[in-house]
Curated annotation (Swiss-Prot):
GO biological process, one term: protein stabilization
Domain of life: Eukaryota
Quaternary organization: Component of the chaperonin-containing T-complex (TRiC), a hexadecamer composed of two identical back-to-back stacked rings enclosing a protein folding chamber. Each ring is made up of eight different subunits: TCP1/CCT1, CCT2, CCT3, CCT4, CCT5, CCT6A/CCT6, CCT7, CCT8. Interacts with PACRG. Interacts with DNAAF4. Interacts with DLEC1. Interacts with SPMAP2.
Transmembrane segment boundaries: none
Main location class: cytoplasm
Gene Ontology molecular-function annotations: ATP binding; ATP hydrolysis activity; ATP-dependent protein folding chaperone; beta-tubulin binding; G-protein beta-subunit binding; mRNA 3'-UTR binding; mRNA 5'-UTR binding; unfolded protein binding
Protein name, UniProt field: T-complex protein 1 subunit epsilon
UniProt keywords, alphabetically: Acetylation, ATP-binding, Chaperone, Cytoplasm, Cytoskeleton, Hydrolase, Isopeptide bond, Magnesium, Metal-binding, Nucleotide-binding, Phosphoprotein, Ubl conjugation
Length: 541
């Protein structure tokens, strides 16, 4: 092992260690280290703050290759931000955790963590120990989560009445670039989830929902297809563009004459030899096509390609085919059509065929772009959301927005309790934490009050982004919540003339809101317990 330093002795013979390269290392300790962390976290949170809510602004991210992404999604913004500070990287991870677990609320969790650290900075300046602040935050988070359980309402999750789910999805999509048609998008997301949901296990398999996009048309042209869309076309332009009552052979084996496993060499010495080889290949192809047709199949979908000669023979024998279909699409087609994937040609039987009511090739506008749509499948639990849009950026943002909406609906199927948005839940929790703080006889009381103040940053950011006076709006709503004992009163971001979020149908999932508070508190607690940073300094040239 490499030596880390040199052992030396003082004048009394006592040993001490001189650590190597200590002069080239930077070190921050105590309050200075904490302030450095808080400053980095605040910088990230302040960047995200303007993206919060239905009137939140989008961010344009340009990567090293010059590719542009315009997005409102917190996790996407943070993942594309080029951050160097260690704590800023932790904020990125925090947002990713929220995205992986819940799928929505990624901006809010970062803004809340930044507000908690900002409040902690003021307490540190007043001489309160970081551990006491962390403990106070922990107590306050527990109270807030218990209070959320008390003020939550249940939403009826019923396939025959999807309206409550649509209203929740609309809240999620309200802040996105697709909010011009968010009712339509919410309906598409809800129908997709309810189609594939397993209501007995209360779970949703996202593998059965495929999201495809094609540039052209308008966002309003987006539709839900009860089947699979593949970004391929029939292998020959003269093949029929539509196959009705398709019996599909799903092949992952090469569509070509078999090759010996061992190394081999074939000498073609004359024209006759070459013709004989060509004849053998043709006979073998015809034999394979005959084998497919004997099973009753009238469409072949291959993972691998086949040459032009085979393509011509398929056309001659009236067997439409699709080549170079990717692995995930092959699996989805097999699930949707109820077919079995055939890895060896010899194993193909009629029992392994998939069934679809219609397989057709569709074209787009004046371009040569074509796609294959497989509909009316045997298993109706596989769906595709097909997005249209003016450019690639809008389609990518629509995909991210729909991902958030799909996650929110899945969370409602798992746990159908909701709280009201527009900052209503945060204001109610802040009031509950403040009341409990007054009963706390220890120093943690200050931290609990600071936690309540931090919770109010979310509704203040919402009102600020909506062009209101944040302090005045916040004061009025807080006073009304206490006076009317109504935890559904929040910020009227859309200027509809009512602060009642229940009336406005601004709904958020309870599981998502709990996760926000819990993750932000854990993160802040971890940061407050760091009091020493050592990192290598700039190397001397």
């Amino acid at each position: 092992m490499a030596s880390v330093g040199t052992l030396a002795f003082d004048e009394y013979g006592r040993p001490f260690l001189i650590i190597k390269d200590q002069d080239r290392k930077s070190r921050l300790m105590g309050l200075e280290a904490l302030k450095s962390h808080i400053m980095a976290a605040k910088a990230v949170a302040n960047t995200m703050r303007t993206s919060l809510g239905p009137n939140g602004l989008d961010k344009m991210m340009v990567d090293k290759d010059g590719d542009v992404t315009i997005t409102n999604d917190g996790a996407t913004i943070l993942s594309m931000m080029d951050v160097d500070h260690q704590i800023a990287k932790l904020m990125v991870e925090l947002s990713k955790s929220q995205d992986d677990e819940i799928g929505d609320g990624t901006t809010g969790v970062v803004v809340l963590a930044g507000a908690l650290l900002e409040e902690a900075e003021q307490l540190l300046d007043r001489g309160i120990h970081p551990i006491r602040i962390a403990d106070g935050y922990e107590q306050a988070a527990r109270i807030a989560i218990q209070h959320l359980d008390k003020i939550s309402d249940k939403v009826l999750v019923d396939i025959n009445n999807p309206e409550p789910l649509i209203q929740t999805a609309k809240t999620t999509l309200g802040s996105k670039v697709i909010n011009s048609c968010h009712r339509q998008m919410a309906e598409i997301a809800v129908n997709a989830v309810l189609t594939v949901a397993d209501m007995e296990r209360r779970d949703v398999d996202f593998e059965l929902i495929k999201v495809e996009g094609k540039v052209g048309g308008r966002l309003e042209d987006t539709k839900l297809i009860k089947g699979v869309i593949v970004d391929k076309d029939f292998s020959h332009p003269q093949m029929p563009k539509k196959v009705v009552d398709a019996k599909i052979a799903i092949l992952t084996c090469p569509f070509e004459p078999p090759k010996p496993k061992t190394k081999h060499k074939l000498d073609v010495m004359s024209v006759e030899d070459y013709k004989a080889l060509q004849k053998y290949e043709k006979e073998k192809f015809e034999e394979m096509i005959k084998q497919i047709k004997e099973t009753g199949a009238n469409l072949a979908i291959c993972q691998w390609g086949f040459d032009d000669e085979a393509n011509h023979l398929l056309l001659q024998n009236g067997l439409p085919a699709v080549r170079w279909v990717g692995g995930p699409e092959i699996e989805l087609i097999a699930i949707a059509t109820g077919g079995r994937i055939v890895p060896r040609f010899s194993e193909l039987t009629s029992e392994k065929l998939g069934f679809a009511g219609v397989v057709q090739e569709i074209s787009f506008g004046t371009t040569k772009d074509k796609m294959l749509v497989i509909e009316k499948c045997k298993n109706s639990r596989a769906v595709t959301i097909f997005i249209r849009g003016g450019n690639k950026m809008i389609i990518e943002e629509a995909k991210r927005s729909l991902h958030d909406a799909l996650c929110v609906i899945r969370n409602l199927i798992r746990d159908n309790r909701v709280v009201y948005g527009g900052g209503a839940a945060e204001i109610s929790c802040a009031l509950a934490v403040s009341q409990e703080a007054d009963k706390c006889p220890t120093l943690e009381q200050y931290a609990m009050r600071a936690f309540a103040d931090a919770l109010e940053v979310i509704p203040m950011a919402l009102s600020e982004n909506s062009g209101m006076n944040p302090i005045q709006t916040m004061t009025e709503v807080r006073a009304r919540q206490v006076k009317e004992s109504n935890p559904a009163l929040g910020i009227d971001c859309l200027h509809k003339g009512s602060n009642d979020m229940q009336y406005q149908h601004v709904i958020e999932t309870l599981i998502g809101k709990k996760q926000q508070i819990s993750l932000a508190t854990q993160m802040v607690r971890m940061i407050l317990k760091i009091d020493d940073i050592r990192k290598p300094g700039e190397s001397e040239e």
